[in-house]
């Protein structure tokens, strides 16, 4: 399929912070020239040099994505190469700054196979369809999500929980490749003209809930007006707040449903039916990082007497 995009709009605001730890690509409120990919990163609050980490990852990943052939499908294997480049850029940045730096990640890209999305942490990715609402919303890699899933706290309690901003997956420099966190990967070919994709840091979602976002983004206003409304509501957030909004102008598909012939392992012809079904895959392959997040959750639960 061929996906044509409208003019993207974005914002990057300080909120009530003194320094800016968010970074976006492209780094413009209205980029005059843009690639078919978009990135938003949030330097982890409280860690040294978060602003360096977010910029290093966004720019390192963007440089690698510029070498991708978007006229074919973009696979998780392709993304691993891009992710490796981002980690390399982060490791290099850490040689001149603090090794304690870290950042969240959100990335979307449009290609022949549809739209691929990857994320780590509590920055989010949304896919909206104006007449249907939210088609996809990423699930935060956070302590509070683990507690909600475990039934320790309710969704309502999570909104004001003191640990709601503790994340358990992020990008941080390391000399050991096996210690690198991996993202959750989501891919869909269910894309129509008028669909809107939205990336943002938690400085936005801390002050605007999903229902309000849906009301604004699925309204009849222009994309620029939608961006302006979200920026206005996020302006006084306690945290840096950054977002990118991009809508689909046109989708030219080959065949939405088609079959292909191939040989199976026994040399027999088999027929596969290909449908535009969204696919979500967790690329976290390092159990030690998952276990460390689990141990952190247990420790905080003990401290808070949950």
Residue positions per predicted region:
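PP2C/PPM-type serine/threonine phosphatase catalytic domain
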Residues: 1-306
């Amino acid at each position: 399929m061929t996906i044509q995009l409208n003019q993207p709009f974005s914002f990057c605001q300080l909120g009530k912070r003194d320094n800016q730890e968010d970074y976006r690509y492209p780094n413009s409120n209205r980029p005059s020239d843009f690639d078919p990919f978009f990135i938003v990163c949030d330097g982890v609050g409280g860690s040294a040099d978060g602003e360096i980490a977010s910029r290093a990852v966004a720019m390192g990943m963007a440089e690698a994505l510029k070498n991708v052939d978007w006229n074919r499908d973009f696979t998780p294997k392709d993304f691993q190469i891009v992710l490796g480049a981002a980690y390399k850029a982060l490791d290099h940045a850490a040689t001149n700054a603090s090794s304690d730096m870290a950042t969240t990640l959100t990335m979307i890209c449009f290609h022949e196979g549809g739209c691929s999305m990857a994320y780590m942490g509590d920055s989010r990715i949304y896919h909206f369809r104006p007449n249907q609402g939210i088609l996809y919303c990423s699930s935060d890699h956070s302590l509070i999500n683990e507690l909600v899933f475990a039934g320790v706290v309710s969704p309502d309690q999570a909104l004001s929980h003191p640990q709601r901003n503790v994340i358990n997956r992020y990008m941080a420099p390391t000399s050991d490749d096996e210690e690198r966190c991996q993202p959750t990967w989501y891919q869909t070919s269910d894309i129509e003209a008028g669909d809107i994709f939205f990336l943002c840091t938690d400085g936005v979602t801390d002050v605007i809930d999903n229902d309000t976002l849906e009301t604004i983004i699925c309204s009849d206003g222009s994309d620029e007006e939608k961006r302006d409304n979200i920026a206005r509501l996020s302006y006084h957030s306690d945290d840096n707040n950054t977002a990118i909004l991009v809508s689909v102008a046109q989708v030219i598909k080959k065949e939405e449903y088609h079959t292909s012939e191939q040989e199976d392992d026994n040399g027999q012809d088999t027929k596969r039916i290909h449908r535009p079904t969204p696919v979500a895959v967790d690329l976290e392959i390092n159990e030690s990082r998952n276990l460390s997040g689990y141990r952190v959750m247990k420790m905080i639960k003990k401290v808070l007497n949950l």
